[in-house]
């Protein structure tokens, strides 16, 4: 989310969780399909006909669309120049639904596609009349959407199991991308994915929120509770491309939004490519992340708010050089609401290890690579912040006295920018950075890019460590946070032989176009 970089606080009514997306009632009024557990998404969006049928008895030849759709999915016609059958998911998913990998088939969502209905804050006492949904997506499946109001929402008490593999990632993308009509600057062509859980968050004036409920930005969905280990499912080897949509000023859908998501949820090997807002935004909760790639976000790479107390290890952020949101950052970490005194505020406590942030290579207003405000109590270890832009206001900024009081901890962090700190906050920022161990404020980057042939030319892809980065002694990550793994290096990628980011991503290696 793009913060007001001249203001130092966010008000209770303005910290971006109360403005709701007005979803039409007609989008939620669904005809029956098959059984009462699965509702029909309606007639075809692309001129196709008919409802769901049974899978074809034989596999169609390559380039030939499947004859029909699986039971429970609506046949909405052909896409990709007539080579793929488009099968639309129900807009309301109650009970269990599996999206199977089938030859000649791509899947679609239209409008708000909800998994379950909100079951409330207490897993032991779900809201009367609420329903659980469990959506399972098989490895290699592609799902597209056609507009900004199309998004996938997993409600409290429901789960999403989207588990791809390195060779067969699951891809969420836009209709334009399926039709071959996107470029490396395309963005904002559909909404995104929203997970809403029952873990604590700060949208109440309580030190320890127990039954605190908030509304997820860009939706009318509720999140929050007191279940730190809440489980919203598993996401592994997933691409989310060309997403993000501004509903109104300060109220947007991101590539991936996680609100009140608990530590029982698995988020591992996720790429968000060209989101028109943030790549990933986390509101509260205790979810942990590992192996994250965020490239080309128009706003922030990773944005956290309202009391997130989890960790993330092994992450790459590469920012696009220019866009409508000029004041973006690789990290923007906040702790709204600031209407609560700091001593009573349920502040965010993000813990980050082995990240490489590559800021905008912009000639004007590139701003900062990492930004901390509103009392965020962050810990950053074994990481690299860099940007080549001479317009950069600074590698890092601690924006206000509350954040200086809470304390941002830096250990084994290597920064290489024209200025290490934003001048307006340099005293606070320098005090925090120099208090840590093994930190380098004015380093010379020796980061390198992947081998020639990458498909993204509109951003710097220099995220592989060189001699200067590898000369920094790392701290023991597992001592800082039990979720972390100890490493012998800082940054996301140690050297050319460190290939965790290859094979399942797009745009970063030759032949893997987005």
Task: Label every model-predicted segment.
Residues 2-8, 23-78:
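Bacterial Sec-dependent N-terminal signal peptides
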Residues 15-25:
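Sec-dependent N-terminal signal peptides
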Residues 42-48, 60-132, 146-157, 164, ...:
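Extracellular beta-rich repeat passengers
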Residues 142:
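Catalytic metal-binding/acid-base residues of hydrolase active sites
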Residues 168-169:
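Glycine-rich loop(s) and the adjacent beta-strand/alpha-helix scaffold that form part
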